[in-house]
Amino acid sequence: DQYDYPELTANFEDATYDWANMPYQIDKNSPQEQIEAVALLGYHAGVSVEMMYDDDGTGSGAFSVDVPYALYNHFDYASCNFKPRTVSSQVWDSYIMEALEMRRPIFYAGTSKEGGGHAFVCDGYDENGLFHYNYGWSGSGDGYFASTAIDYPNDVGAIFDIMPKEVHKNTSEAPKHFEVVPAENNALSAKLSWK
């Protein structure tokens, strides 16, 4: 027998998220207010990308390309883009490093060799240049890996520019018409100017 599940909805406009009660990790022994705070955000995140919940665990039916729209329209984040990996590993790794240096977590997605897809988070790096991937699943499989050695190496894509609208609005643009003029006497100095 198949059960017809009701359509899931959320009132994003009136939602208030209790960020103070969202620790890095929770479990069944966590205080109820923490469980409820994390559950509400997780539920709204799923609804925002039209995730399909089922009792057989075969997948979510959600698409990573829907995440930027959800972040912008439902969670007050600045416009961002899902970027498929179409560049060399060196360039891709530089994108990762830049985002992490700016303290921005990276939404990551890919498919396994068997074809199953998964979305996860890249949230750090170590002194060896390996990146920390959080796959979910209560920490199972998390660890530091080269970007080419992750569990979902095919059809890789990521969102590097995730930030709240308020932060984006207050972030200055890079200088335009930037010019570097070396000092005349071969000194180790330069004059920087921009308009």
Residue ranges and their predicted role:
Residues 80-84, 157-158, 178-180:
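Generic structural motif
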Residues 101, 114-116, 125-172:
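Cys-His-centered catalytic/binding microenvironment captured across papain-like cysteine peptidases
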Residues 72-134:
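Active-site-adjacent substructure of cysteine-protease-like catalytic cores
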Residues 1-84:
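Cysteine-nucleophile protease catalytic domains, especially the papain-like/related folds used
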Residues 33-57, 95-104, 151-163:
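Short, Φ-rich (hydrophobic/aromatic) sequence segments
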Residues 165-194:
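Pro/Thr/Ser/Gly-rich low-complexity, intrinsically disordered linker/stalk tracts
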Residues 67-68, 72-74, 85, 92-97, ...:
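Short linear, low-complexity motifs centered on an aromatic residue
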